[in-house]
Amino acid sequence: MPRRKQEQPKRLPSHVSRQEEAEGELSEGEHWYGNSSETPSEASFGEVQENYKLSLEDRIQEQSTSPDTSLGSTTPSSHTLELVALDGEVLRDSLQCQDHLSPGVSSLCDDDPGSNKPLSSNLRRLLEAGSLKLDAVATANGRVESPVNVGSNLSFSPPSHHAQQLSVLARKLAEKQEQNDQYTPSNRFIWNQGKWLPNSTTTCSLSPDSAILKLKAAANAVLQDKSLTRTEETMRFESFSSPFSSQSASSTLAALSKKVSERSLTPGQEHPPPASSFLSLAPMTSSAALLKEVAARAAGSLLAEKSSLLPEDPLPPPPSEKKPEKVSPPPPPPPPPPPPPPPQSLELLLLPVPKGRVSKPSNSASEEESGKPFQCPICGLVIKRKSYWKRHMVIHTGLKSHQCPLCPFRCARKDNLKSHMKVHQHQDRGETFQCQLCPFTSSRHFSLKLHMRCHQHFLRTEAKVKEEIPDPDVKGSPHLSDSACLGQQREGGGTELVGTMMTSNTPERTSQGGAGVSPLLVKEEPKEDNGLPTSFTLNTADRPANHTKLKDPSEYVANSASALFSQDISVKMASDFLMKLSAANQKEPMNLNFKVKEEPKEGESLSTTLPRSSYVFSPESEVSTPGVSEDALKPQEGKGNVLRRDVSVKAASELLMKLSAESYKETQMVKIKEEPMEVDIQDSHVSISPSRNVGYSTLIGREKTEPLQKMPEGRVPPERNLFSQDISVKMASELLFQLSEKVSKEHNHTKENTIRTTTSPFFSEDTFRQSPFTSNSKELLPSESVLHGRISAPETEKIVLEAGNGLPSWKFNDQLFPCDVCGKVFGRQQTLSRHLSLHTEERKYKCHLCPYAAKCRANLNQHLTVHSVKLVSTDTEDIVSAVTSEGSDGKKHPYYYSCHVCGFETELNVQFVSHMSLHVDKEQWMFSICCTACDFVTMEEAEIKTHIGTKHTGEDRKTPSESNSPSSSSLSALSDSANSKDDSDGSQKNKGGNNLLVVSVMPGSQPSLNSEEKPEKGFECVFCNFVCKTKNMFERHLQIHLITRMFECDVCHKFMKTPEQLLEHKKCHTVPTGGLNSGQW
């Protein structure tokens, strides 16, 4: 049998001796296992000896038990069986191994599935036995095929981090091979017939594990180099030949890993091996340059794809079994790329990671998808991406690492800084964003967007407004913004828009309907109303005449639209403004009786038709109400042109009607009036102008059969351009007085319905007539809260409209006082007078301690806090006491508290503790407790009580004697001159109504009413109400008022004590805020 094997054609002749084989064994041990000794490692040598002792019968049995043989043969070949009994020495002479991986293909080897040997031995036997069988059969057939076909037909799965590791390993191996004499032969082991046989090869020999790694590296390198054409590969591989057919290298890896996993999971079961091919481990070339080139190509592909995100290998199904194909000269068509092997099988083929190294996945997605998210150690928030985690940690650290180079602005995020830098860009270009409806200007477009929300009730097509749906929780009001309503009537042109706005069954449905409504569309809601109060309607249903019960205030929610007037006029003034607008919108006198709708009647129906600028509200009954067809709700084209003339005034009227809900709120859980009251028409033939049917909860519901009467020809419509021009809300005085004249001309009011009017001092009597809605403050409710627009529950029920004129006799003061300069409206004449002083250039309120001058008294009061004094007006009172302390009841305290920092003194412990909290920490201990009977001073309250109990028991408080300590002559002179001046001018100060009295802001100080009390109380400051007991303390206090140098801001004329404070203060004027210019409002 050995003779017959020798007669076989030798494919790879050997030219080395047995001694070189032993050296090759040593080289294998040194290169792969890292042994530095000259003897082979014990593991490799023992394994070789064990494989040599394998019996011939066992090997024959292993080869014959496989159901398939190499190259698709179903029965074992006789030549294959004879190969098992071949002697080891003959095999060493007939085989050789080269340093490069052959790209040739052989079928999957036969192996015993039931073998219980270690996984490494089975894997080597699986690889090498199959390659030898294919070599023998293919050589017998005599068919040779160029390996370029393999390279051209290979198709691989996408590269993973495993493939990248293999490519790096292949590159390292190639570099070592070149260093160890690339073209000189050396010894290594090869696997044959179940034994490891040393043979001649290069110095860099391959073990089965290294062969697997190189196989994977070569396969992935070919995959990554997709840009190479077939001709280039032909030139590269044309000098090599292979007798095997071409298949996919990835299919090889899939089959190999599946085989290994089956052997490792179920070693006792037999599994028919798939017939798919895998790359042969038989070396076919003697050049290490090709391996180096493949590794270099793989490294170049990795660098090219470094920036792209590499997907992780998916879990594929096991490779499908297909019939083996015989080797033929023409290359078969390239098969579809098979799925890559499972990750668990692929892990078996990987080289173990050396100690000290950690293999990290190359793509960021693999780390995020591997179930290892980032968790915040402070709040426990789990974040998927590391960049998001870093940005989240700024919340806890508070680190603002981004600094604006032009101003002190700092932020934590780069995008916020980028948005901030746009402000400086607009400032450098001189760009500002101007509101088209008011004088508002801003350097940021976003600030203009926020500002435009104020004008959403006066929406214009040319103004870019960020439209928002109003609060849908206001019950009884439409779920459509008035900006959308006006936007439709302006953008529509000749088109006519109409919608049916009905209240929903539940508050939940109401909120959903309001949230889903587009700003320019009308949403139809259910027609039943089972729980919500209906809107403001005009009904002809028969009801009790004296039905005046108000709605429960808990059913209403505060309207956010009142913020429009929050900076300009109060809500009460907005309500007064509303009443004049509503009166002007009346097309003809009507006999109305306003009542509060308590519960709608059955059979009450919707209004019939609407112009294009209006919407219908359907106050349905709480039980059931028949629906209304859409034909009855279509607009009338003939009435649309009438409303185009005064639609702006109606919009303002409806807005202010909504704002009037705020004017009746009671803060202390008292029933309030938040919505307009119901209107009941006594005469059913009275028709209402279409202009009343606008926008909010003031829409009037009428019967279907009621005809829509045209506007009288002799009636002058309201001003059309009243709100069409770009004016601010603060210029409402023009509208107010024009409408007041129209109201007074059109309606004749009796003295019972007219309340005495307080006219504005800035308008003549003939131009400004008395308004029927005005009232005197003396006729208001007795409670003082009514003066501020608050009405108690018993009085709110008395608010009704007088029948006969259709105008209400409201029980609160609604006279408005506008400013001629800026148009701002005030509710009191005193407030207007104080406001007018801001428009004058004269600064008549001057500080007597420094050069500061203010336009109004409030600003001077605020400024005087720097000097620890307060300015008090004596316009209406002869004597004003600025401070009324609890200790001013005449009680005599045995001791008092004195502050060493500012000289403040008080006898009450609570006031003194409150005062000392104003100082910094190091100054809070600079105080003393002084005895009123003597000069005893201490810092402990227990000591002063002991002192009083032992020394001054039963004694009355005495006037403290003057101290003998030296004093400053300048302070004494100032005190004497000030005291003498105050004695001479004391009576004049009390007589003059417009003079100023300077008193102390300290709550514990005793007020000084006249100059005669000073000798009894000791030393009293002429600049403030400070009184002290000793002269040295009085002189120390005077130093506060003798500040010779104050640092004044040249922009706002504010004084600072130190130049550092002034420098810090000036930064407020240099940093742009993007807000409203103070001079315009």
Swiss-Prot record:
InterPro entries assigned: Zinc_finger/UBP_domain (IPR050688), Znf_C2H2_sf (IPR036236), Znf_C2H2_type (IPR013087)
Biased composition regions of type Pro residues, renumbered to the chain: 327-344
Location in chain, cross-link Glycyl lysine isopeptide (Lys-Gly) (interchain with G-Cter in SUMO2): 176, 216, 226, 360, 372, 466, 475, 523, 549, 580, 587, 597, 634, 639, 658, 673, 704, 710, 742, 778, 798, 870, 891, 958, 1014
Start and end residues, zinc fingers (C2H2-type): 374-396, 402-424, 433-455, 817-839, 845-867, 897-919, 929-952, 1019-1041, 1047-1069
Subcellular location: Nucleus; Chromosome, Telomere
Residue ranges annotated as motif RRK motif: 3-5
GO terms assigned for molecular function: DNA binding; NuRD complex binding; zinc ion binding
Cross-link Glycyl lysine isopeptide (Lys-Gly) (interchain with G-Cter in SUMO1) per UniProt, renumbered positions: 673
Annotated Basic and acidic residues bias: 1-10, 631-640, 947-960, 979-988
Region annotated Disordered, chain positions: 1-77, 258-280, 305-348, 525-553, 616-640, 947-1013
Start and end residues of each stretch annotated as Mediates direct interaction with RBBP4: 1-14
Record field: compositional bias (Low complexity): 961-978
GO cellular component: chromatin; chromosome, telomeric region; nucleus; ribonucleoprotein complex
Residue stretches of biased makeup (Polar residues): 62-77, 616-627
Keywords: Chromosome, DNA-binding, Isopeptide bond, Metal-binding, Nucleus, Repeat, Telomere, Transcription, Transcription regulation, Ubl conjugation, Zinc, Zinc-finger
One annotated GO biological process: negative regulation of shelterin complex assembly
Similarity remark: Belongs to the krueppel C2H2-type zinc-finger protein family.
The protein's role, per its UniProt record: As part of a ribonucleoprotein complex composed at least of HNRNPK, HNRNPL and the circular RNA circZNF827 that nucleates the complex on chromatin, may negatively regulate the transcription of genes involved in neuronal differentiation. Could also recruit the nucleosome remodeling and histone deacetylase/NuRD complex to telomeric regions of chromosomes to regulate chromatin remodeling as part of telomere maintenance.
Subunit structure comment from the entry: Part of a transcription inhibitory ribonucleoprotein complex composed at least of the circular RNA circZNF827, HNRNPK and HNRNPL. Interacts with the nucleosome remodeling and histone deacetylase/NuRD complex. Interacts with RBBP4; the interaction is direct and recruits RBBP4, a component of the NuRD complex, to telomeres.
Protein name (record): Zinc finger protein 827
Originating organism: Macaca fascicularis
